[in-house]
Curated annotation (Swiss-Prot):
Protein name, as recorded: Heat-labile enterotoxin IIA, B chain
Function: The biological activity of the toxin is produced by the A chain, which activates intracellular adenyl cyclase.
Signal sequence interval, chain numbering: 1-19
Cellular component GO terms, alphabetical: extracellular region
Disulfide bonds: 33-104
SUPFAM superfamilies: Bacterial enterotoxins (SSF50203)
Length: 123
């Protein structure tokens, strides 16, 4: 069994057992994002994960299948932050398992800055 299938099965089982993976944007996620100045971007299929250690760049980026680019805090801004590390892990799991995500992202920055991410297995 390929590692991609194993990770996909793991993500799916974790979602089923924990009840934390929703079809569409969950009410809890919507409430969290509504408390910020960010906007919800639903049903994003991430395809690329870019980690750049160049001192002139921000560090971690994800790219969707439609070409959208988002920045994950980390690298230069919060290198040891546990929560931004969890967003990076969620992004990698979504890419490896072909699972869509819902993003809470600040659209006034370029690239858009991700503040929260939710796996969305049935979008």
């Amino acid at each position: 069994m390929s590692s991609k299938k194993i990770i996909g099965a793991f993500v799916l089982m974790t979602g089923i057992l924990s009840g934390q993976v929703y079809a569409g944007v969950s009410e809890h996620f919507r409430n969290i994002c509504n408390q910020t100045t960010a906007d919800i971007v639903a049903g994003v299929q991430l395809k690329k994960y870019i980690a750049d250690v160049n001192t002139n760049t921000r560090g971690i980026y994800v790219v969707s299948n439609t070409g959208g680019v988002w920045y994950i805090p980390g690298g230069r801004d919060y290198p040891d932050n546990f929560l931004s590390g969890e967003i990076r892990k969620t992004a990698m799991a979504a890419i490896l398992s072909d699972t869509k995500v819902n993003l809470c992202a600040k659209t006034s920055s370029s690239p858009n800055h991700i503040w929260a991410m939710e796996l969305d297995r049935e979008s």
